[in-house]
């Protein structure tokens, strides 16, 4: 009967297991770093895309801000002779020339419409966290200015416009002013100086608010241009 000698495998030293563990750890760690870097790059790219999109929104906004501003400037110009017209009307209720200009200049106003597609994405999709702190601050400041202006527009100025329109209905002859162009006939349907005075008081407030909104629009446009220059210099968008 043959007896086979058992083959003894040399026992591995602890250093062998240490190096195996270290290599495995490094492989996992490097994989984690690679994944982290990839996610970081993806988020950085997404953040830049938001900036580019917001930049395009600002280009639209500046164009529309200019149009609205010019509309208000035209109003203020057309309504600049309020005091002289008031004196003329009290002296002659048939005075038509100055009233025609005041009537046209106080009809309606340009609503400020801004492009908020990127802003909504930044807010609703958590996009603000992808922006650098200074970039996010610029976006938030501009958004606050826009929302503040639109709040004034839909409250204070709209109320002033509504009041003026209501008084105009009591004062002007529909048959003469219905097409926006004054035709022959008596322009006023009342000689009540109280109503005439109310109209000019409301008109005076309207002019003051128009001048105030010109300043606000100029500030908004200046802020938009500054942000565009800042982003363009930082990210070379154009």
Model-assigned labels for residue ranges:
Residues 20-34:
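Hydrophobic membrane-insertion alpha-helices, especially the h-region
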